Amino acid sequence: MIDRRQLLAAGSALGLSVFAGPGLAAKPDFSARLAAIERAAGGRLGAFVLDTGSGKSFGWRQDERFCHCSTFKLSLAALVLREADAGRLDPAEVLPYSRADLLGNSPVTEANLAKGGLPLAALAEAAQEVSDNAAANLLLRRLGGPHALTAFWRTLGDPVSRLDDYEPDLNVIPPGTEKNSTTPRAMAGTLRRIVLGDVLTPASRARLTGWMEQTRTGMSRIRAELPADWRVLDKTGTGMRPGVGNKVNDIAVLLPPRRAPLVVAGYYENPVFSEDTRPADEAVLKSLGALAAEWAGA
């Protein structure tokens, strides 16, 4: 198994090794460095990094499809807030639920089971901040099902992303289909519009970004080796299933001081199944974050 030091070495292996002329080093090929990270890790990496100030970008497999896993919950929380902004939902509306609705990784809904229900806003916060699976399913049902989230993405100009199932089935793309998938480029664009655009009112956008900034599920992923003064707004996704392997995802808006935000979307698939998330898999996205910071001139 590849370790973290090897991944970091792979991330820099293709940096300044080619000379454009006597004494002049060519600019690093950051896409090639992503490819090197993928080769060292042994799985499949999809990544896209966008500088929202210049419009410049780089990526690897950025137009190939990857499973959302729980990264969809950021968009789900945004949809709840957008519907509230439009007056079609009351964020204080309480959705009832019972023990039968609970799934693995449902910490907030399980802790509040005795209440018999939680407000829409609290469920959206739980889905984003701690990736509560029961909360996500309750919200999807209230909004009209997974296709409602797909429709939301279409209104944002995203013709690629789609959601077809509920938790936990949405963590797999059925063979021969494009279900429950997106591409790094498409999701980066959607994330930019939600977080940095006018999809939400200023108050709702501040609420969502507050939840994102409080999210701690990705401490070993994109944000792990960023400069200490960068703010990070992100949502992770993780999938582990025998016969399918493991998935480790993270989508993020990076807010460096004194420069335009970066949007980063990373999806890594390890074909070897493990019951637990492997640090080496998360290190792939850690390397992606470090590479994005280097590219931005940090």
Residue map of PLM features:
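Structured C-terminal helix/loop/strand segments within mature extracytoplasmic catalytic/sensor domains
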Residues: 2-9, 27-34, 142, 189-220, ...
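Active-site helix/loop module of the DD-peptidase/beta-lactamase fold
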Residues: 88-118, 148-168
